[in-house]
């Protein structure tokens, strides 16, 4: 198996973290990546990032809407404050809309074709069963609005099931739930971001999930990491050569984001040293 039909993007929030953010673009390009993704760009001017993309021949393939906040300061502080999106959070509709509009403005400058809208957390002190109906209604209404705004500028919106081991109380956890939401909203530019790490942690049966959902055309982005420690794809319990073959066989033509923590950590060369799996794919040695 080779990577001829698979396109891998470096996640610059998790890879090359020994370097300042703006130096990670050059490092990714040097290692052969053609695409990049990251969590949030909002601490930097969009034009600064666009210049790095152009200089190093990289395509921006994905980033997140803000984790919260209604202004620049709030958006930049939201993640560290424990926020994980506002799409399903009752009463945060104005905050949600401000974040989506900010993300779309950045996406247009970066020529990025999709943005990830994080679902958010279920409220504390309320049982999940009691909180879910209102969260679901809020989520669907917000995604209707976000997809309509994004469609005006030719951008896709993706939603990602995330496991509750890593993010307790996260609203969206399962692939079937995400696809049901996409169908309920009914917008052509709303799709699922399928993170195989989260899928394995929550429900397993990853290859069958790929074969079930990729042919629908509703998977807009894939991400990979080893399980259980979220290191390189060749570290852990998942058989990624088999899964990459399944992705190829399903005819998936989108990007695969490398959203993992290098096993060597944030040390000089740590990311590059861990890319043996990608180099082996390029030469067909990882069968």
Named regions from a protein language model:
Residues 32-35, 89:
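Short, basic, glycine/proline-bearing loop/turn elements
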Residues 37, 61-64, 116, 158, ...:
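Conserved beta-strand positions in the central sheet of alpha/beta enzyme cores
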Residues 2-13, 64-86, 119-127:
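N-terminal small/glycine-rich loop or linker at the start of catalytic domains
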Residues 56-74, 106-119:
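Short coil-to-beta-strand
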Residues 1-32, 42, 54-57, 102, ...:
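Histidine-acidic metal/acid-base catalytic patches
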Residues 37-56, 64, 119-123, 127, ...:
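Glycine-rich, proline-tolerant flexible connector loops at the mouths of alpha/beta enzymes
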Residues 80-191, 201, 285:
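Active-site acidic/histidine proton-transfer and metal-coordination neighborhood
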Residues 24, 38-41, 84-85, 92:
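Alpha/beta catalytic barrel-like cores
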